[in-house]
Amino acid sequence: MVVTKGNKTNTFYVYGGKDESSYMLIQGITLAGVLLDEVALMTRSFVEQALARCSISGSKYWFNCNPDSPKHWFYQEWVLQHKAKNALHVHFDLEDNPSLTEKIINRYKSMNQSIWR
């Protein structure tokens, strides 16, 4: 997808990191940044390849995730070590979502029991 505003043009590529062979989709490409949506569901090889492809000076990474365990590799290496990686860590809870009613929040909480509660 190509987006132009004024004299600036950006090209966006969309890939999935669903399995171990996914890293090959982006191998060899030069990127100025990546947005990895639900990064905890992606394979580590895809994530590491995406980060390695960000070779333009000033490249940025954006992640969002809901790791299923405090032992998840992404949680261990990025969330817990965000300061060492010069990363901004922002945490949100269900209650932070202004579009969710209290009834919906309670329903979600009753459906999803996890170690995070």
Task: Map each language-model feature to its residues.
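Short, flexible loop motifs at catalytic/binding sites
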Residues: 1-117
